[in-house]
Structures are given as structure tokens and as C-alpha cells.
């Protein structure tokens, strides 16, 4: 078998939807977790530098930020493992579907995995194919563990609902920083607003970031404009935007996973001719 033919067979058996979704998932989670972690750190510095001089005022906020950062560590680890499992499940179900439709130009791993669903035969032994059959046996064992695509569909559906809430929550800091930036623009260009510059403020207490008895709790006028011009504010604002984009990319990847897995499961269930799940 030539190299070109081998590559062609691998491409035919590859689950492209799962591959794209996996890449998008890893990219989105990395963007969300990395940028979100640094954005929370930047927010902590801005609060303690400009909005409150008393540590007790923002002690609870710091504890919440640190808790969210630990959650981010766990989220990154979980999605790395779950994304790899979903990719393996994509190879598994795609190989089984192609075998049902009579397309045997699948990869060795795809054949090994699909054998656990369709009851296909194992490869014929030979000295030259010893390594190939070893890989097939490993994939066959993996297929027994992955042989519940309906459960993967259910778990992915529940995870998508949870991540939809995460996506909505990731928009909150973007909204707060955007409002602050808009206020700064009004201060920088007073001709665009009828309000006096001194009355234009950013109040962290209004968003529940600080308690109402925090002092000063808000920054107004030219002081607020100077904060908006700092590199810390600009970087934190853009990091939250990047984290929001990462959450959106992860949501799209989960939807892609769910659609592809549901389609493959439906095909196997309806056309598997006695397939057992």
C-alpha cells in the first residue's frame, strides 16, 4: 500500500465534524480559561488600587475571584479529557456508521472500534500486520468502553446547557467594563453629553462588586478618565472580551459535538440491524 493510498483511507475514515469540534473546543477553553484567569487578576488590582482603600471592603471579592480561578483550573483539565473522549467517540461512531453502509475504507482504529458495535470480524493475523492488529485490539478494547454513544449524547447535552449559563455569565464583566469605557468616552468628549464631567462616574457598588458601605466605591470625572487610559484597564477589558469569545467558541464546539453524535447514534440505532448499545 502506497503512502498516498494510506493517507486517502485515513481521510475517508476521519470524523471531520468531531475533529473540527475538538480543535474549536480546545481553542475556546484555552482562550476562556487563560484570558479569564488573567482578567480576574487585573480586576482585583483595579479594585484594590482605585475603588477601595479598606481591605475588608473587597476581601469577599478576592475570595470569590480566587475561587473562580481554581474553578478555571478544573474546567481546563476537564475539557481537555472530555474533548479527547468525544473525539474518540467520533472515530468510534463514524467507523460504525461507515461499516453499516458498506464503506470499509476506514482507519484501523475505526474498524477496531466499530467492531464492538456491529460485531464485525477482527483482522486476519499475519506477521507483516502484527503491529496493525495490536493497534486494532487496543482500539477494540477502547470501543467496549466507549460503546454507549447515547450516554455521550446525554452528557454533552447537559454540559451544553451548563456552558450556556457560563457563556451568559462571561458577558457580565464585558458589559460592566464596556459601560465604564463608554463613560470615559463621554468624559473625554464632553460635547457628546449634556451632563457635567464631575457627575459621570463608575460605581463598583452598583454592580455588586463592592458592598454599599465601601469607600470611595466609585470614581468620577477626570480620575475615571485617567483609570481608563491605564494599561491595566485596557488589558483587563480586552482579556474579558477574549474570554467571552472563548466561551462562545466552546459553546459552538459542544453544539457541533452534540449534533454529530446525535446523528451517528440515530443512524446506528435505526439502521444497525440489531445493534446493541
Curated annotation (Swiss-Prot):
One of its GO terms (biological process) is axon development. The keyword Transmembrane applies. InterPro entries: Myelin_PLP, Myelin_PLP_CS. A lipid is attached at residue 199 (O-palmitoyl serine). Keywords: Cell membrane, Disease variant, Disulfide bond, Lipoprotein, Membrane, Palmitate, Phosphoprotein, Transmembrane, Transmembrane helix. The modification Phosphothreonine is found at residues 116, 118. GO terms for molecular function: structural constituent of myelin sheath. One of its GO terms (cellular component) is plasma membrane. Residues 1-10, 89-151, 269-277 are cytoplasmic. It is found in: Cell membrane; Myelin membrane. Residues 37-59, 179-238 are extracellular. Disulfide bonds join 184-228, 201-220. Coiled coil: none annotated. It is a multi-pass membrane protein. SMART domains: PLP. The chain crosses the membrane at residues 11-36, 60-88, 152-178, 239-268. Belongs to the myelin proteolipid protein family. It is linked to Defects in PLP1 are the cause of 'shaking pup' disease; a dysmyelinating disease. This is Myelin proteolipid protein.
Amino acid at each position: 500500500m502506497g503512502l498516498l493510498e494510506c493517507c486517502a483511507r485515513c481521510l475517508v475514515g476521519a470524523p471531520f465534524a468531531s475533529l473540527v469540534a475538538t480543535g474549536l473546543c480546545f481553542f475556546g477553553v484555552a482562550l476562556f480559561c487563560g484570558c479569564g484567569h488573567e482578567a480576574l487578576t487585573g480586576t482585583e488590582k483595579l479594585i484594590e488600587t482605585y475603588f477601595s482603600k479598606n481591605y475588608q471592603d473587597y476581601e469577599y471579592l478576592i475570595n470569590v475571584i480566587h475561587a473562580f480561578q481554581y474553578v478555571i483550573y478544573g474546567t481546563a483539565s476537564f475539557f481537555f479529557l472530555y474533548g479527547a473522549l468525544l473525539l474518540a467517540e467520533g472515530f468510534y461512531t463514524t467507523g460504525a456508521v461507515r461499516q453499516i453502509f458498506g464503506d470499509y475504507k476506514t482507519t484501523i482504529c475505526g474498524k477496531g472500534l466499530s467492531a464492538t458495535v456491529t460485531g464485525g470480524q477482527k483482522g486476519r493475523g499475519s506477521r507483516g500486520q502484527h503491529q496493525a492488529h495490536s493497534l486494532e485490539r487496543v482500539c477494540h478494547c477502547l470501543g467496549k468502553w466507549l460503546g454507549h454513544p447515547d450516554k455521550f449524547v446525554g452528557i454533552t447535552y447537559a454540559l451544553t446547557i451548563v456552558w450556556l449559563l457560563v457563556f451568559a455569565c462571561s458577558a457580565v464583566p464585558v458589559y460592566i467594563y464596556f459601560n465604564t469605557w463608554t463613560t470615559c468616552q463621554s468624559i473625554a468628549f464632553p460635547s457628546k453629553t449634556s451632563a457635567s464631567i464631575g457627575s459621570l462616574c463608575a460605581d463598583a457598588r452598583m454592580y455588586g462588586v463592592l458592598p454599599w458601605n465601601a469607600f470611595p466605591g466609585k470614581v468620577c470625572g477626570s480620575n475615571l478618565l485617567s483609570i481608563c487610559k491605564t494599561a491595566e484597564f485596557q488589558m483587563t477589558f480586552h482579556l474579558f472580551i477574549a474570554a467571552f469569545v472563548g466561551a462562545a467558541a466552546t459553546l459552538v464546539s459542544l453544539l457541533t459535538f452534540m449534533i454529530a453524535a446525535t446523528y451517528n447514534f440515530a443512524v446506528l440505532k435505526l439502521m444497525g440491524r440489531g445493534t446493541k448499545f
